[in-house]
Amino acid sequence: MSFITEIKTFAALGSGVIGSGWVSRALAHGLDVVAWDPAPGAEAALRNRVAKCWGALEQQGLVPGASQNRLRFVATVEECVRDADFIQESAPERLELKLDLHSRISAAARSNVLIGSSTSGLLPSDVYESSAHPERCVVGHPFNPVYLLPLVEVVGGKNTAPAAIQAAIKVYESLGMRPLHVRKEVPGFIADRLLEALWREALHLVNDGVATTGEIDDAIRFGAGLRWSFMGTFLTYTLAGGEAGMRHFMTQFGPALQLPWTYLPAPELTDKLIDDVVDGTTDQLGKHSISGLERYRDDCLLAVLEAVKTTKARHGMA
């Protein structure tokens, strides 16, 4: 079966932080968007979120014809997906809810329309267990803010057709994203597994009084974080090996992996640890509001993305 990859109408189910990010990205790429969310006040909240991020999208560059007015909010799942060319679900992370929702989505959608789920913690074989035509169903796990960050992890389940994965990658690329095909179904996929390891270590360091939350964030943003925006861990360590590269690095520093530097198991989330983390991040926020911090983040990301894009082009890097 061939799947639709030329998208004119994008269906978004769930309009929270992630869902609204998908809506904003699709609108910015000149698509008609049909959205559904059963929560009271969801439409007003969605339109407000889209309006808040539109300035950043304008700065990044809108596709001709892009408009917030191309968003339509509907009352039922069936109306949302019936005429859609691509469907993205971003409902809460509860398996029972997603099973019921995808049963309804797949029954109402055309059989050659791809269905993506934004889930970060559930496996596609489980999410799509009750779906009709599960061969067209994938996980498309994005990163916040979805309307700016390009990474989307694409994961197939036991019934997903290889052609559906390639078709989904093509669709996500058309939305200006950088799809990463996760080859096996594993909990947390790729990026969140890496982030979870860092998060656990950070909590241990706070819990043991080694560092404050601000000091840990400084260790990241003034060190590895600057490199991570343009060069990942493996290339960074390749450079650390000098002219001999990664093999020399592994030979020289490989034994250090046996040193007990890291805790790995998650710390117990005691009231004290939670309080320490909350107090620390409150101090970091200072006088700034969450919305103000979001605007700061967006401006930084736009600047970093543009700088990396320009520098990559100059050096012929992918």
Curated annotation (Swiss-Prot):
In terms of domain of life, where is this protein from?
A: Bacteria
For binding NAD(+), which residues are annotated in this chain's numbering?
A: 14-19
Catalytic reactions of this protein:
carnitine + NAD(+) = 3-dehydrocarnitine + NADH + H(+)
* Keyword entries, A-Z: Cytoplasm, NAD, Oxidoreductase
Q: In which pathway does it act?
A: Amine and polyamine metabolism; carnitine metabolism
* One of the GO biological process terms: fatty acid metabolic process
Gene Ontology CC entries for this record: cytoplasm
Primary location class: cytoplasm
Question: Which PANTHER family would you find in this protein's record?
Answer: 3-HYDROXYACYL-COA DEHYDROGENASE FAMILY PROTEIN (PTHR48075), 3-HYDROXYBUTYRYL-COA DEHYDROGENASE (PTHR48075:SF5)
Put simply, this protein is called L-carnitine dehydrogenase
**What organism is the protein native to?**
Pseudomonas syringae pv. syringae (strain B728a)
